[in-house]
Amino acid sequence: MAHHLAKALMSQHEIINIYSRSFDKAADLAQVVHAKAVSHFKQLNADVDLVMIAVSDQSIPSVISALTEYLPNVLIVHTSGSTALSVLSTRHARAGVFYPLQTFSLERDIDWSNTPLFVEATENTDLQRLHTLAESLSQRVYSYSSAQRLSLHLAAVFACNFSNYCYDMAKQVVDAEQVDFSLLQPLILETAQKATQNDPKQMQTGPAMRQDQNILQMHQLMLVQAQRADLAEVYALMSQQISQRHS
């Protein structure tokens, strides 16, 4: 996320420093966004408006504890969907959140203008600053609480991470028979469009919703015969859940 955020922000904002545990990574990104890489928090320029922490959730507490020693008066925000504002605010007075609800892969560019951005802060003036900053990137900016943001993060795991794993399983099935996975692309895109334009429950189709036991059993047998007990287990669980949801 740090790479994408820095590149997006540099077009309208000056980025002063980049820090990473790996100085080489910091230097590479700093070169891209015309900033100065540093190898220690004490080297960070204290005369800045904002510091962003874009690290793993478990690293946030230790990072903010170290940062506040050198930047006691600077607004510091994290970019996590699942970490409460209090993780920062209990350690630093001027704390905030700047969370983009998006999936990031280094090799893919992001359409920031349509990416929802969620901001939160301990002080109203800082909240407005974050709102203004977010609006420089996206048309969809929201002031959400930590609890609301966490619910979105949980929902995103279902909508993004789990669905992508389903695509992975689908590819494994067709790869085993030398069938081109791209043949499923129109189906995948139509499913996503229907789910975003309608109530997903009302758009459910398939043998589990119809409770077509002949098809369900045939698919299960195919997976068992292919020695894919792992896929058979997922198929059975999801079919059961869909059937119960529509019974």
Which residues does each predicted region cover?
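Hydrophobic/aromatic beta-strand patches that form the interior of the parallel beta-sheet core
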Residues: 19, 38, 52, 77, ...
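NAD(P)+-binding Rossmann beta1-loop-alpha1 motif at the extreme N-terminus of oxidoreductases
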Residues: 1-40
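Short, well-ordered alpha-helices that flank and scaffold nucleotide-derived cofactor binding pockets
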Residues: 3, 7-11, 31, 65, ...
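Internal alpha-helical scaffold of NAD(P)-dependent oxidoreductase catalytic cores
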Residues: 25, 29-32, 109-155, 159-196
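Short, polar loop motifs at secondary-structure junctions
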Residues: 21-25, 80-84, 124
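NAD(P)-dependent Rossmann-like dehydrogenase/reductase catalytic/cofactor-binding core
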Residues: 182-247
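Glycine/small-residue-rich loop that forms an oxyanion/phosphate-binding "nest" at active or ligand-binding sites
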Residues: 44-45, 49-112
